[in-house]
Amino acid sequence: FSGIINWISNIKNKFFRKILEIVAGIDKRVQLPKYNSETFSNFFRKNNKKINYESNKSDRKVVIYSTCFVNFNKKNTGVAALKVLKKNGVEVQEAYPGCCGMPFLEQADLPKVVQQAKKVSKDLLNWIDKGYKVVTLTASCGLMLKFEWPLLLPEDENIKKLSTNVMDIDEYVVDISNNEGLVEGLQEID
């Protein structure tokens, strides 16, 4: 199915892009994101145990919050994050309980953002209660979990707890580098 959508939405497909422009108002010159043939969540379920490295196990545990963009459009970002984390001895799980609500925030649909915050936080809190940190792979989603949700639900203790246990993937890898150091084969970029 993703192959058909990608073919129709390809900027070189002038016929269907003209139809998209007329029907949906999507400018035919705009390059639309491609869809993965497999979600990152499905990839993780099938491949997580197969990805093993001879590295020291650490006490670190994370749950990757896949995000809509990585799950449906940029699976390779999730695969790369999974490999880097596992290479550094981190126990990795994955969760995608739904969208963080950023698209709804952009449309000023605050009730829908609150609904998503409550739904997603409920699932992610289960991981936090098991000792996991939540790692986001898309900066805007990390922003929602860490800063926007607490602004919308300032009295919600679950949202507060979640917001203090979320890190962006780059922030988390820098934390590993600063504390334990990165394993051989991984190095800082100047």
What kind of region is each of these model predictions?
Residues 1-190:
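Iron-sulfur cluster-binding electron-transfer modules in prokaryotic oxidoreductases
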